[in-house]
Structures are given as C-alpha cells and as structure tokens.
A protein has these predicted regions:
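Lipid deacylating catalytic domains
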Residues: 1-138
Length: 138
C-alpha cells in the first residue's frame, strides 16, 4: 500500500516510470476483519488493511493508478495473508496483474516468500526494466 499511497497521495508519480507491487492489499484482506485485539496491537498497520479502512477509502477515491506510470502487480496463488487473493489485483486500465504461477507453473511461494524467491526477484527486475512478461493468458 505504501507505494500506491506515495504515487497517488504524495505526488510520487512525477518521479516514477514503472511500479511493481508484490501482493498488495489494495482492496483489503479478510484477515484484517478478524476481531482479534492482540493482532491489531501487534500489527498497527493491520487496521489499514481492513477493506473499509480510512486509508483504503482515501486511496480508492478515484483511480488508484496515476498517469505516466506503468503498473505491474505480482501475486502468488499461495498467499494466506492477503485473502481472497484476487483482492490484490488492481482492476484498472493498463495495469498488468500477474499470478506468478501463470509464469512459473507449479511454483510454491508464499506472501512473504516472494521477497526471497530468486525467480520472483528475476520477474521483478524484468518488469522494472520494462521487459515484456508473457503469461498463459496473454
């Protein structure tokens, strides 16, 4: 969410050509709805992940994406943090929403594991460099 917030709310789009988001909670996560006070105290940002949080309402006023920035969203079907997984996609024109498993069939990578997985990191580099990424669906 921080990257989307920077680009839109802090005028960061003037400084960014390509943005790659990993498993973003742009539409919230059902885990944030868990009425577990201990979780909220441990994870202060979890309240912002609630689908109806003030942060998400502010971010989603109008388009999330900004003109002039190429957006890619990388998602793993194995995510157990931002659920349902489809909530991670930005459903706006020009956004390339990608399941890692569409590029790497059978790939087992978790939400946090995306940060350490060399094949995922290679995909990020290609996207940042503007290289074409072909999925089974395009």
């Amino acid at each position: 969410l921080i990257g989307f917030y920077y680009l839109k709310m802090l005028q960061g789009a003037a400084h960014v050509d390509r943005f790659v988001a990993l498993a973003p909670s742009v539409n919230g996560t059902s885990i944030a709805k868990t009425p577990n006070r201990d979780l909220v105290e441990y994870c202060l940002a979890c309240a912002d992940q609630h689908p109806r949080s003030a942060l998400l309402r502010e971010l989603k006023t109008g388009a999330i994406t900004m003109p002039g920035v190429q957006y890619s969203v990388l998602v793993t079907k194995n995510d157990k943090v931002v659920v349902p997984v489809e909530n991670q996609f930005v459903k706006e024109p020009g956004v390339q929403n990608i399941y890692i498993q569409d590029l790497l069939p059978g790939k087992r990578v978790s939400h946090s594991g995306m940060l350490y997985d060399t094949e995922t990191l290679d995909l990020i580099v290609k996207l940042v460099q503007g290289q074409s990424i072909r999925t089974a669906s395009n």
